[in-house]
Every structure is written in C-alpha cells, then in structure tokens.
C-alpha cells in the first residue's frame, strides 16, 4: 500500500483504539494499536515492554472490520505500518509484529530474521530449522529437559555478525500448544496454569519449569539442524 492509503486508514482508526502498547523487540519499538482485549493481553504477556519515552519504529493496527476479508493484511514499507483485519489467531499477529521488527533491523542495521528455534548447549548455539509441522518447537522443548541446554527462542530470532554469528532472542515468553504436556510430561504444570485460546495455544513463562537462568538473550551459533518430515528422504540421520 502507498502512504496516502496508509494515512486514510489511520484517520479511520482513532475511535476504535482502546489499547496502545509498545513492545521492545530486540531494541525495535513496535507499537500495537487495537480494540481487541485478547490481542492486547497476549501482546503484553508475549513481549518485553518498551519505555514510553521511546518513539515507535513500526506500528501494527489490529481490529475486526466487515468491509475486509478474513485475515487481511495491508502494509506500508516506507512507514513500517501494518493493518490487520479479522484475525482470530494470535500466532499470525505476533509473527507479523516480528516481521515488522525484522524489516527495521535488516534495512537499517544489517540484522536478519530467522524463523526457527535456537538453543544453547554448553555455550554453543544451535539453530533448529524446518517447515511448519516438522517439529521445531517439539524438539526444542524436548532438549530443554536436559540441564545443560538453554533456550534463546522457540520460533523466531535475530542474527548478526560475519565470521561468528550471534543469535538474539525476540520474545519474553513463548506461545505453546496445549498438547506439549502429552509429548513431554515435564511441562504438565505449565499447561495446567495456562489460559489457552480457541486455537489451543497460550503464552506461557517457561521459567516456571526450567528456571530463569536457562532462558538466554543470545548465543554464538555453531550448528544448524534441519528437520524434514519425509520418510522417503535418503539423508535421514534418525528415523
């Protein structure tokens, strides 16, 4: 969308805005503007809060409007402003917020986004990649049962550097599935205390189970693991 269309949409919003929250996503101030209680609540649980003294670098408007199709997204790359209409899944909303931060970081600072999980094992970082449903999150929480494993991110993180790549976390708390405890019983308490949405997911504080010292802000990447869910793949390491 162009700046003119963006300005017209912004002018139509003031009466709808009930919540304004700025998230600190690796130093980028992404501002949420919404009239939806559940979006505001998940947002505040999900991200670190940015100081009110910091002006926003990107903006995300989220609301319901019958004039637009389901899951509609309009984006102005010049002002880093996104409009989301008729979303009922928070996972997509947070992914777009992370994308906005990634757009700012890549354009202005040469810092790149990776959609994947990142863990630290004895001081060495490993990135876990794979298509949707490959098991990135499941394997991450499985690895976290080991005391020497610490987590940077289970879904999205940022990378910078040349010879030595540094991975940085993007979220304060994680968005888990309700079935995680049926796979790894160690997380039963976490699931019992969580408030799950209509998609069977919830923002939770993993520190309740693993402790605050096993959630790291960054690590040095040394290994890459690519998960492929294909029984016919000839390069299978573990079946």
Predicted features, each with a name:
Residues 4-127, 146-147, 158-239:
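A noncatalytic interaction/capping subdomain that flanks phosphate/NTP-handling catalytic cores
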Residues 151-157:
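Flexible phosphate/Mg2+-sensing switch loops adjacent to catalytic phosphate-binding sites
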Residues 123-146, 151:
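Glycine-rich phosphate-binding P-loop
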């Amino acid at each position: 969308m162009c700046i003119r269309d963006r300005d017209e949409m912004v002018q139509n919003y003031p009466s709808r805005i009930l919540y304004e929250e700025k998230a600190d996503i690796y130093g980028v101030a992404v501002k949420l503007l919404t009239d939806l209680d559940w979006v505001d609540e998940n947002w505040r649980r999900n991200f670190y809060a940015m100081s009110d003294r910091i002006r926003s670098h990107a903006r995300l408007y989220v609301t319901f409007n019958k004039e637009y199709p389901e899951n509609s997204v309009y984006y102005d790359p010049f002002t880093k402003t996104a409009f989301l209409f008729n979303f009922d899944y928070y996972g997509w909303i947070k992914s777009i917020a992370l994308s906005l931060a990634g757009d700012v970081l890549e354009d202005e600072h040469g810092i790149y986004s990776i959609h994947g999980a990142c863990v630290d094992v004895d001081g060495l970082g490993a990135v876990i990649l794979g298509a949707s449903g490959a098991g990135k999150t499941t394997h991450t929480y499985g690895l976290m049962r080991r005391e020497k494993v610490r987590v940077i991110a289970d879904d999205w993180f940022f990378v910078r550097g040349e010879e030595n790549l540094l991975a940085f976390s993007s979220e304060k708390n994680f968005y888990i599935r309700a079935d995680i405890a049926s796979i790894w019983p160690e997380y039963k308490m976490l699931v019992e205390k969580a408030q799950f949405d209509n998609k069977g997911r919830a923002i939770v504080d993993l520190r309740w189970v693993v402790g605050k010292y096993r959630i790291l802000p960054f690590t040095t990447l040394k290994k890459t693991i690519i998960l492929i869910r294909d029984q016919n793949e000839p390069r299978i390491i573990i079946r």
